[in-house]
């Protein structure tokens, strides 16, 4: 166990698997109390058990980030349990694979917008007031290479991530005077359940792992310069070196 985040409380959305799980484990390993949130409680409980068995502190909370009532309630309960939230990691996201932009079903578009973009906004909306009041806090929003490079087959997902990037940079400017830093990560292809079976044949033998993204998140939470805000770190990895346009996480 390390102590880079000792006495800090981190809320991680989409923490039951993949990138969110890895970020939660890394932050707990550096001393943070971690609130794990997601739509399915069972994987969250499993991650919490893993963290606790390693000597860390974690709790699990069922949460649909697209629901304002649920976000408000869970943020209130976490703040009541641990007194504050120091670090917010907006990781929760979904993707509908292989849907051409022009024929994206409306229900798929709406669902991705609700979770990926609205969910990020709602969590910030209900966590930031306490950070602003304390004049300190860190927000880490997970974007995607699809938010910087157009993807013909991931239209809705790419649009949500373009939105997350734009929202992040605007939010950073508005809360900077209050001591709150807002940054993000743009992963490319990461080996997670969400990308299972989607790895391009020309992407090369290497594939970015969730732990790689988690280490970058730890940098933003513990090592980033005090004046670093409104910035995204691109993590396209070996996929980009292969010449294949990076795809979504």
List each language-model region with its residue ranges.
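Conserved glycine-rich cofactor-binding loop
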Residues: 9, 16-18
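The beta1-alpha1 cofactor-binding region of Rossmann-like NAD(H)/NADP(H)-dependent oxidoreductases
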Residues: 41, 63-74, 106, 211
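Active-site helix of classical SDR
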Residues: 124, 160
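Alpha-helical segment proximal to the catalytic Tyr-Lys
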Residues: 129, 173-174, 226
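Residue(s) in the substrate-gating loop at a strand-loop-helix junction
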Residues: 144
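C-terminal helical subdomain
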Residues: 177, 184-185, 202-241
């Amino acid at each position: 166990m390390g102590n880079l985040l000792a006495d800090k409380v981190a809320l991680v959305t989409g923490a039951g698997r993949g990138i969110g799980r890895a970020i939660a484990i890394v932050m707990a390993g550096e001393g943070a109390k971690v609130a794990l949130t997601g739509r399915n409680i069972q994987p969250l409980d499993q991650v919490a058990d893993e963290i606790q068995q390693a000597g860390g502190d974690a709790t699990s909370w069922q949460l649909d980030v697209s629901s304002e009532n649920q976000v408000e309630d869970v943020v209130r309960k976490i703040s009541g349990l641990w007194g504050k939230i120091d670090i917010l990691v907006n990781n929760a996201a979904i993707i509908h694979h292989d849907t051409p932009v022009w024929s994206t079903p409306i229900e798929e578009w709406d669902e991705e917008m609700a979770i990926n973009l609205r969910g990020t906004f709602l969590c910030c909306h209900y966590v930031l007031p306490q950070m602003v009041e304390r004049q300190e806090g860190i927000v880490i929003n997970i974007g995607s290479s699809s938010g910087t490079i157009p993807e013909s087959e991931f239209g809705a997902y790419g649009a949500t991530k373009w939105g997350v990037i734009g929202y992040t940079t605007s939010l950073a400017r508005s809360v900077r005077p209050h001591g709150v830093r807002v940054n993000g990560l743009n992963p490319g292809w990461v080996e997670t359940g969400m990308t299972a079976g989607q790895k391009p044949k020309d992407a090369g033998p290497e594939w970015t792992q969730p732990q790689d993204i988690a280490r970058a998140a730890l940098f933003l939470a513990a090592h980033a310069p005090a004046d670093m805000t409104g910035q995204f770190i691109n993590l396209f990895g070996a996929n980009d070196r292969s010449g294949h346009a990076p795809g979504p996480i």
